[in-house]
Amino acid sequence: MGDFVIDLIAATLRIATPLIFATLGELFCERAGILNLGIEGTMFFGAFSGFTAASLSGSLWVGVLTALVGGMLSGWLMSLFSVRLGVNQHVSGLGITLLMTALSLFGFRVIFGENRILPSIEPFKQLSIFPNNPVLGPIFSQYALTYIAIALVPIVWWIVFRTNFGLNLRSVGDNPEATDAAGINVYRLRTIALIIGGGLMAVGGSFLSVAQLGSFTFGIVAGRGWVCIALIIFGNWH
C-alpha cells in the first residue's frame, strides 16, 4: 500500500507538469481580463515545435526554448486580434487554436513526411534528488521541467499578488476603464500578459513531446488546455 501511494504521488507530479505550466500561463491572461481559448492550440504548437526543434538540433533544451518562443508568438497574435483589433475574445481564441493546430499538423507532415512509423527522440532523463531515500527518492525522481513547474508556482504567485506589475495586471482585469484613467497602458499590459501566458502554455505542451513521450502525435494534448481553464476557475483565479 505504501509503495502504491508513493508511486501515485510521483505519477501525479509528472502528469500535472504540463497542466501547471499552462494553467499559470492562463492565469496571467485571465488576470489581465482576457479569456485565452487559444490555450489548446498553443500547447499543441508547443508540443510540435519543441519536438521538431529537439529532433533537428539534437538538444532537448533547444526544443523547449523553441516552444517558448513559438508560444510567445501565439500570445502576441492573440493580443493583436483581441486587444488591438477588438475581435471578440472567444472568436479570436478559438481561431488561434485552429490556426496553431493546423500549422502544427501541416509542418509535421512537411518536415517528417507521412510515414506510418512516428519519429522519436531520446526524451529528458529523470533527475533524482534523494536517490537513497526509499520514500522521497521515487517521489522526487522527476524531469527537470517538473521541478521548474513546481518552482514557478510560488514565483508566479509572488509576481501576480506582491509586485506593482501584478497589481496593475489585476487592476486591468478588474476595471480596465479606471486603470486607463489612472494613466496605465491597458493595451501594453494585456499584450505582455498574453505573451507571457502563451510562452508558458507552449512549454507545457513541449513537456509532452520532449519529456513524457519523446514523440509527437496528433492527439498529444488531448484536451489538457480546456482542463487548465477549468482549473483556473476551480482555483478562484489564484
Predicted regions mapped to residue ranges:
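Alpha-helical transmembrane segments within multi-pass membrane transporters and channels
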Residues: G58-L103
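Membrane-interfacial amphipathic/re-entrant helices at transmembrane-helix boundaries
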Residues: M1-A22, L35, S49, L56-V62
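Short, non-helical or kinked segments that cap or interrupt transmembrane helices
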Residues: F28-G46, V83-I96, N168, I192, ...
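Transmembrane alpha-helical segments in multi-pass inner-membrane proteins
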Residues: M201, S215-H238
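Small-residue faces within membrane-embedded alpha-helices
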Residues: T12, A16-T23, F44, A67, ...
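Hydrophobic alpha-helical transmembrane segments
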Residues: I9-T12, G41, W61-V69, H90-L94, ...
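Transmembrane helix-bundle core of multi-pass membrane transporters
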Residues: M100-R162
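Helix-loop-helix "hairpin" substructures at the membrane interface of multi-pass membrane proteins
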Residues: P138-F216
